[in-house]
C-alpha cells in the first residue's frame, strides 16, 4: 500500500500510510491527545486507546468512538477474541469513519488475559486468523494486527514467522505492527513487560526481508528521530509509544524529518489551536484537568517549561472550567 497524497508532493511517492504512527496507549491516546497530535503532525497515523468489543456492543458507543474530523488518518484498536463480535465492532468503527481497524494481540495485562484477548492470542494463531478474516469481511477499511514477537516459551524468529504466516495466509492480514519485545504472561506486570524483555528489532526487519509482500511496522524503543529514520530503511513504518507523550513536542519534528515536508511546526500555534478546542470542550462539560494532560510536555527542554507545567498542574484542578489557565501558562514560557 502507498500513500495517495497529490495535495502534498513533499510526501515520498512510495511512502506507506504507516510510515509514522503513534501507538494506541491506554489512558493516553484519547481524542484530546489525538487532536493535539494532529496540530503537530499532518502525516502521523493516530490510534485510539484499545476499546473492547463488549464496550462497543453493550456500552456507550459515542463515548468510545467520538473523534474530530481533523484527526484523520485515525485507527480504532479493538480488543477481543470472538470473531463475530469483532466483526460487528469493526463494522461500527468503520461506520463512525475510522480509517483502519486494528486488532490488539500484544497487551499482556491480567485483565486482558482474563478476557482471553491481547498477547495471549499469540498462542492461538488460527483463532487470530479467523478474527481477522471476519473483520475484513465486515469492513472496507484496512484491518491490521499489532502483536508482540512472542509470549512466554516462544523465543525464536521461526515461531514468530509461523504466527505471521498463519494470520496472513488464513486471515488475509497484510499489515503487521510488531512490538519488538516478547511478553511474559505470568510474573511481569504490563509496565515490566514494556521494559524487561529485551528489544529484538531484528524480528521485524527480518520479517520484512522474508515477507516483502507484507507491510511491517516496527514498534518498541524508538525515542529519537534519527533512529526512526534509520529503521525506515528496513521496514515500512515506525510506531512510537511512550516517547510520544513523555515528550509530545517530538511530533513537531516528524513531518520535516520523516516526510520531507518543508513546513515548520510552531508549537505555540499548535497550543493556541488546542486552546480553542479546550474552550469548546469545556462548554460540553469536559473538565480542564483532563484536557491539560496532553500538553504538559509540549515545551520540554525549553526555557520556562517547568513553570509552564507547574502552573497547569496547580491551577487546572482549582479552575476546572477556565481555559484562561492555559493562557497564563503560556506567559511562563520565557523563550516566546
Residue ranges: model-predicted function:
Residues 1-336:
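Flavin-dependent oxidoreductase catalytic cores
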Amino acid at each position: 500500500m502507498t500513500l495517495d497524497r497529490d495535495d502534498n508532493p513533499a510526501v515520498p511517492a512510495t511512502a506507506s500510510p504507516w510510515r509514522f504512527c503513534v501507538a494506541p496507549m491506554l489512558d493516553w491516546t484519547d481524542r484530546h491527545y489525538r487532536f493535539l497530535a494532529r496540530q503537530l503532525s499532518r502525516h502521523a497515523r493516530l490510534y485510539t486507546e484499545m476499546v473492547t468489543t463488549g464496550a462497543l456492543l453493550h456500552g456507550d458507543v459515542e463515548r468510545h468512538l467520538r473523534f474530530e474530523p481533523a484527526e484523520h488518518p485515525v485507527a480504532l484498536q479493538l480488543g477481543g477474541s470472538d470473531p463475530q463480535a469483532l466483526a460487528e465492532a469493526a463494522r461500527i468503527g468503520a461506520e463512525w469513519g475510522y480509517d483502519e481497524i486494528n486488532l490488539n494481540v500484544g497487551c499482556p495485562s491480567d485483565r486482558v488475559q482474563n478476557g482471553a484477548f491481547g498477547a495471549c492470542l499469540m498462542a492461538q494463531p488460527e483463532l487470530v486468523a479467523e478474527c481477522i478474516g471476519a473483520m475484513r469481511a465486515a469492513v472496507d477499511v484496512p484491518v491490521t494486527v499489532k502483536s508482540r514477537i512472542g509470549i512466554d516459551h516462544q523465543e525464536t524468529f521461526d515461531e514468530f514467522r509461523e504466527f505471521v504466516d498463519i494470520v496472513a495466509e488464513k486471515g488475509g492480514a497484510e499489515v503487521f505492527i510488531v512490538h519488538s519485545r516478547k511478553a511474559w504472561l505470568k510474573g511481569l506486570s504490563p509496565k515490566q513487560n514494556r521494559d524487561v524483555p529485551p528489544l529484538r528489532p531484528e524480528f521485524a526487519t527480518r520479517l520484512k526481508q522474508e515477507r516483502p509482500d507484507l507491510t511491517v511496522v516496527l514498534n518498541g524503543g524508538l525515542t529519537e528521530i534519527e533512529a526512526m529514520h534509520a529503521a525506515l530503511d528496513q521496514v515500512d513504518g515506525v510506531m512510537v509509544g511512550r516517547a510520544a507523550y513523555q515528550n509530545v513536542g517530538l511530533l513537531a519534528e516528524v513531518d520535516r524529518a520523516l516526510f520531507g515536508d518543508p513546513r515548520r511546526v510552531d508549537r505555540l500555534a499548535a497550543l493556541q489551536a488546542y486552546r480553542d478546542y479546550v474552550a469548546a470542550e469545556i462548554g460540553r462539560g469536559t473538565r480542564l484537568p483532563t484536557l491539560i494532560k496532553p500538553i504538559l510536555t509540549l515545551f520540554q527542554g525549553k526555557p520556562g517549561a517547568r513553570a509552564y507545567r507547574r502552573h497547569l498542574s496547580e491551577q487546572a484542578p482549582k479552575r476546572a472550567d477556565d481555559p484562561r489557565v492555559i493562557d497564563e501558562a503560556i506567559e511562563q514560557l520565557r523563550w516566546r
